[in-house]
Each structure stands twice: as structure tokens, then as C-alpha cells.
Amino acid sequence: NCHKAVYHSIYLRRLTPVYLYPDIVPGTSLAGTLTKEQIEAALIQNPDASAVLLTSPTYDGITADIASIAETVHRFGKTLIVDAAHGAHFGFHPGFPKSPVALGADLTIVSLHKTMPCLTQTALLLQKGSRVSTERLRLFEGIYQTSSPSYLMMAAMDSCMDMVKKHGAGLWDSFFTERERFLERCSSLKRLQVLTDGTKWSRKMTSETGFLMDSGKILSETSKTCLTGKRFYDILLKQYHLQI
């Protein structure tokens, strides 16, 4: 579930990674995310580890129990870094999971362009607390970041945040109204399954794994239909102009 930027960092800094593998969500082919038990066991076996990095939410919207993981990581005196690229909208509406920042993560990366109205490449690195040195963070930011930042992108991020501040509540309320309408219409489907937060599937997943589901993600399961995933993708794109 890691972004290739993580592997680039490992290569450039000559780090020694320890890999933890998430379980598959029961009844699906979806990779879950990590649990506090997995992380605690890994920290016991690797006491010289500097930090824990995990992806939450995943590309499919599956979210880890960041609060309990943060407590575990900090108990061992380590830093928690969360790649929340697909969770830039977290914390802006009670219908979404809380932001990792609010749950104890020391560093959180969010990609505005993935789930918010912003230009491609726009992202934020969020810091909480003093476990990570701000001076050191700024030092390496200056090393790896361009010395000629795009004012177009910075203006886009400002505009995005301004819109969320002024109109976000109403826009998210409208989103959830339309979402409920969509799910109600999908409830009559006999073969095509819709997997998202609030459905029987997500409640079962949470009870079995402890993972949460991002309400902003809507997954479709085609295994009980005559369609392949690729064919379903093509139909949505060509006939309905929806790209997934």
C-alpha cells in the first residue's frame, strides 16, 4: 500500500525498512491496513526503528485505527507518519473519519488534488507536536523541494482552503444527501454489489477487523455479474462519462 515516494526515500537515505503486510479483508480481494497489534509486535522485534509509516486511508478507502496505533507507537518513543493522501477531506464533516492529525499522528501527508477541488500535484505535509524537529523538517524540505515553487499551485491551495472554510459544510451536506439517494437506488440491485460505509458489508468488515470505511469511497463488486472489472469500467466511462 505504500506510495513509490516512500521507496524513493528509502533508496536516497539508504534506510533499512521492515515491511508489515496487511491482511486481506474477508470476503474480498481488498488489502486492509495495519493494526496496533501488528505494529506493537514489530516494534518489540525492532527496538532500533526510528518511525512507523502506514497508509490510511488506503486507495480503497479502508482506514486504520490511528488513535490506538499512535498511542502504541508513542509508547515505544517512536514517530508516527501517516500517508493520508486519499484522506484530504477527513475531519471536514462528521460523516467522514477524523483526520490522522486529530488522532495523534506526528506527520500526515494529504493530497488535496485527490479528494478536494485542487490542481494535480498539490499536497500538504501536516505536523503535530514536537516529536519531529520543525527545523530538521524544514531543512529537508528545502533539500528535496523545488527552489521555484509554483504560485499557480499555491494559489489553487489557498482557493481550495478558502472554499472549504466558507462553503464546505453546505457542500458536504449536499454530498451526503446525494450519497444516500444513490445508495437507496442501488439497494434494489440483485447482482452488482456496492461496498461503502453504512452498508451491511462495511458493518461486517468493521466488526471483524476494526477497520473503518471512508464514506467518500464507493466500491463496486462485479464478481456476481457477467461483467469483468475492465468491462464495467469501460461502460461507466464511455456511456456515462464517469472515470473510476
Kindly give the residue locations of the regions a language model identified.
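Conserved PLP-enzyme active-site core in the AAT-like
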Residues: 1-196, 226-227
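Conserved C-terminal alpha-helix-loop-beta "cap" of PLP-dependent enzymes
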Residues: 177-244
